[in-house]
């Protein structure tokens, strides 16, 4: 069982076929910053056009964490993946739905002001304790640290825009008025406990506020106050949290995870580059590359443990995980918090997901067929399909200097071998 395919043997699918009429299908979306949202939109567009018998705006349940919460809330409100691509990736369409990246990087002026007001009192207290000889330098620094803002950017513009989007005709900002279950996961700052907004007892919070709480990454955005408590990014506690859906008698769960560690040993032609300098090993890229790989590995290890646990606790539920190829230098080289290359990244996610579907076609057919879901082979095999109108080749901060014909041939050969391996596994 691999992280990308948690399905049981084909014989198990056949034995369940008689009891899967009217199968219930759920969608779980992990976080990953702006890069994660962009990747998930591109991947969902590829899945939407390829999977016949499933509507992503009419799933039987949604769970979203952090950036995945934005996407899940939109889908639950009837916004198709293509509509979200138009609004966020291409920035065209109706003004009400248009999502401009500037709303995510508005300075948290009110937070700055509130902390600045504390500074004179903290300085006076520190000076007094130093004069009395009762405080060390470390204690003084810790005390003055209270004046530092808890976030660089403000959540308010994000919440206000989402409230406007979800207040449009046919949509709602109220969990209780949705036709289907939506769960947005945040983390209680004071206890570290999971906050599953949308479940009974947690559904009196506006969807727009729950989304901002779920995506309040400490350091970037201030904690979001709801009632008497403060909440931060749900990814601090969970990577996917698909168990919310598994406990609701869901038969099939589609999971999307945008952040994976990079396998730098796959293709030596993919040389790491920082500016014009070639970096033969990730460690030579310094803190940025090492930190990125470490963060991705930490997040993904939790996901792997969770997926293994789901298979044990819910053996009768099929789970299909979609994520970037661990050997993909484009996704590892992209800035997790960048919006500037969103068209190229979305197109890359769209095309790489289509490749993933082609590689896993037989295994996915065996999983989906008992649930009444088919794969549109003509659509999947159409080489002319594109997601956005303008999609130049993405050039991240580090990349292979000049991918030659041999490199391209090796990548194509790798894809063929992957498909052969998948075919043998399901034969």
Each PLM stretch: what is its role?
Residues 68:
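Catalytic cores of secreted/periplasmic lytic hydrolases that degrade extracellular macromolecules
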């Amino acid at each position: 069982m691999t992280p990308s395919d948690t399905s049981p043997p084909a014989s198990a699918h056949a034995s369940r076929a008689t009891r899967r009429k009217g199968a219930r299908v759920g969608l779980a979306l992990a976080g990953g910053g702006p890069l994660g949202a962009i990747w998930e939109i591109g991947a969902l567009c590829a899945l939407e056009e390829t999977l016949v018998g499933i509507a992503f705006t009419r799933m039987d349940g949604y769970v979203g964490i952090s950036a995945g919460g934005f996407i899940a809330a939109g889908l639950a409100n009837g916004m198709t993946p293509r509509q979200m691509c138009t609004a966020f990736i291409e920035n065209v369409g109706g003004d009400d739905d248009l999502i401009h990246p500037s709303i995510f990087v508005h300075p948290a002026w009110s937070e700055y002001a509130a902390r600045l007001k504390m500074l004179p009192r903290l300085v006076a207290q520190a000076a007094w304790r130093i004069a009395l000889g009762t405080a060390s330098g470390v204690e003084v620094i810790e005390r003055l640290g209270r004046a530092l803002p808890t976030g660089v950017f403000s959540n308010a513009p994000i919440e206000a825009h989402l409230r406007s989007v979800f207040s449009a005709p046919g949509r709602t900002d109220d969990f209780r008025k949705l036709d289907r279950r939506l769960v947005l996961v945040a983390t209680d700052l004071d206890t570290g406990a999971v906050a599953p907004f949308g479940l009974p007892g947690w559904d009196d919070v506006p969807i727009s506020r729950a989304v901002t709480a779920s995506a309040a990454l400490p350091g970037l955005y201030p904690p979001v106050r709801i009632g008497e408590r403060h909440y931060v990014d749900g990814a601090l506690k969970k990577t996917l949290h698909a168990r919310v859906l598994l406990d609701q008698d869901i038969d099939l769960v589609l999971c999307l995870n945008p952040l994976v560690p990079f396998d730098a040993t796959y293709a030596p032609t993919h040389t790491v580059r920082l500016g014009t300098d070639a970096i033969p090993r990730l460690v030579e890229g310094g803190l940025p590359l090492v930190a990125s790989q470490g963060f991705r590995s930490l997040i993904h290890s939790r996901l792997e443990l969770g997926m293994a646990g789901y298979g044990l606790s819910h053996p009768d539920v099929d789970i299909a995980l979609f994520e970037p190829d661990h050997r993909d230098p484009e996704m590892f080289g992209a800035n997790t918090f960048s919006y500037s290359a969103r068209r190229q990244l979305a197109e890359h996610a769209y095309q790489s997901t289509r490749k993933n579907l082609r590689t896993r076609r037989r295994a996915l057919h065996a999983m989906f067929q008992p649930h009444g879901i088919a794969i549109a082979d003509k659509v999947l095999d159409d080489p002319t399909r594109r997601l956005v109108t303008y999609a130049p080749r993405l050039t991240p901060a580090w990349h292979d200097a000049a991918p030659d014909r041999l490199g391209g041939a090796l990548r194509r050969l790798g894809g063929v071998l992957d498909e052969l391996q998948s075919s043998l596994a399901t034969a």
